[in-house]
């Protein structure tokens, strides 16, 4: 078996798919920023955590079911593997309906809690209400992707994302620039793009006879519990950057105002693509890790994990270099004001310090939930926003205000990576079959 070619067969399409999912937000920011300006950028930045929550629900349920599908398929338990798919499908639909009702009904109140007021609240509400109405398209679009990858066809998941991405760009141009629909146009384009992604994924599953809806009632409770146990980790992995975004926006509103929020909006659009690329390495290698774990093939598991760490760190460094070289152009891409663009150039190097550490944490987390060590992945995922909150409460009042908001995010990610290394060593000593070698 050629582990290297197998690794890249799964990982490269996954990276592209995850990168495109991050560019969805950038596309909206680009069109809205150039049409409305800083107020539009700030509105999308504040509303985005809600959209990210919707997508994270799909990712968590889909990945939770996909992990158990791969493990059971590797153990030759075909019927049980199919029931995990069916259970996940019904969970995706049910969660979609609940999400639409709650978010649409309480959108203004939720956005107010996230720090929106005035024109920003108005713009963000227009955006998020339409996103809520299309929640089922986003949840199905993100939830089906892990299954397509675990069926052994990462290319098709990439194709589905590309189809949705192109749809989003075309409709953003038409709705926001030609018909001047503003925030509502951007939101409509986003859910239409996700609808195309979901449709392509469902067509693939139906054509390949991988679309299962039957599950024995006696197994529902057990399977839902298993899916949620594993799914909480990728759910958290998708959501915690946006919990961090909420903290940054709230503290920045106090220390730096709208200018600081707009500044980080532009930075986060770009750097989150790098984060998603790193997650693409982890989730792209997950089907292989789960498969080799189910087959009890520890040597192959070690090789895949080693390649994932090395490749993720290389991508983090390369992404950081590209972002640093082009830092002066970031604000202009999103139609930011001159003052905001200057500030972006100043703070980008701060955030780039954390990229290699994020790479380590992302792969460690994926390795844990791919091999049924969800508890350890929970620790890594949720410690980051906790540390960030602590640093933001302590450092800015003592050492320099807004600049320490930026450094608090870096310190939280560095300490999270150190904890990841400790947990890996703990697994090695405890003989928990994590199987990672030194990198």
Please describe what each predicted stretch is.
Residues 62, 131-149, 157-168, 186-201, ...:
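Short runs within selected transmembrane alpha-helices of multi-pass transporters and secretion channels
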Residues 9-28, 130, 141, 164, ...:
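Transmembrane helical elements of multi-pass membrane transporters/channels
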Residues 41-101, 138-157, 263-321, 325, ...:
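Small-residue-rich hydrophobic transmembrane alpha-helices
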Residues 23-42, 111-118, 174-181, 242-269, ...:
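Helix-terminus/linker motif at the lipid-water interface of multi-pass membrane proteins
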Residues 1-14, 69-136, 180-232, 289-354, ...:
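Short alpha-helical transmembrane segments in multi-pass integral membrane proteins
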Residues 38-49, 124, 128, 187, ...:
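Small-residue hotspots at the loop-to-helix junctions and early N-terminal turns
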Residues 2-36, 49-64, 68, 93-100, ...:
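N-terminal transmembrane alpha-helices
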Residues 53-56, 100, 168-172, 197-202, ...:
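Hydrophobic transmembrane alpha-helices of multi-pass small-molecule transporters
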């Amino acid at each position: 078996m050629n582990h290297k070619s197998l690794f890249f067969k799964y990982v490269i399409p996954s990276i592209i798919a995850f990168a495109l999912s991050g560019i969805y937000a950038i596309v909206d920011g680009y069109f809205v920023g150039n049409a409305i300006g800083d107020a539009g950028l700030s509105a999308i930045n504040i509303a985005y955590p809600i959209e990210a929550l919707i997508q994270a629900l799909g990712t968590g349920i889909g990945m939770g079911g996909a992990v158990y599908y791969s493990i059971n398929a590797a153990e030759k338990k075909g019927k049980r593997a199919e029931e995990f798919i069916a259970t996940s499908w019904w969970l995706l639909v049910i969660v979609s309906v609940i999400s639409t009702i709650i978010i649409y009904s309480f959108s203004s109140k939720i956005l107010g809690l996230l720090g929106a007021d005035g024109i920003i609240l108005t713009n963000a509400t227009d955006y998020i209400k339409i996103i809520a109405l299309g929640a089922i398209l986003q949840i199905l679009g993100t939830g089906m992707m892990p299954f397509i990858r675990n069926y052994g066809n990462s290319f098709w998941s990439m194709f589905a994302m590309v189809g949705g991405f192109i749809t989003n760009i075309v409709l953003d141009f038409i709705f926001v620039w030609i018909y001047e629909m503003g925030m509502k146009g951007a939101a409509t384009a986003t859910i239409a793009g996700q609808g195309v992604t979901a449709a392509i994924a469902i067509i693939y599953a139906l054509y390949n006879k991988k679309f299962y809806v039957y599950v024995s009632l006696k197994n529902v409770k057990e399977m839902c519990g298993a899916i949620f146990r594993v799914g909480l980790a990728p759910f958290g992995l998708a959501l915690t950057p946006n919990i961090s975004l909420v903290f940054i926006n709230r503290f920045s509103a106090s220390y730096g105002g709208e200018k600081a929020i707009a500044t980080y909006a532009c930075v986060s659009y770009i750097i989150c693509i790098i984060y998603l690329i790193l997650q693409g390495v982890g989730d792209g290698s997950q089907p292989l890790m789960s498969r080799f774990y189910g087959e009890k093939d520890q040597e192959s598991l070690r090789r895949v994990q080693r390649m994932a760490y090395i490749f993720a760190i290389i991508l983090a460094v390369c992404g950081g270099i590209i972002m640093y070289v082009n830092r002066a152009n970031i604000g202009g891409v999103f139609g930011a004001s001159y003052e905001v663009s200057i500030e972006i150039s100043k703070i980008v190097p701060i955030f780039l310090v954390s990229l290699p550490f994020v790479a380590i944490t992302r792969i460690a987390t994926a390795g844990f939930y791919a091999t049924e060590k969800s508890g350890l992945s929970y620790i890594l995922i949720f410690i980051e926003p906790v540390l960030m909150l602590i640093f933001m409460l302590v450092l800015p009042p003592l050492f320099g205000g807004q600049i320490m908001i930026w450094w608090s995010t870096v310190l939280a990610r560095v300490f999270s990576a150190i904890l990841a290394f400790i947990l890996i060593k703990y697994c090695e000593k405890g003989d928990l079959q994590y199987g990672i070698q030194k990198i």
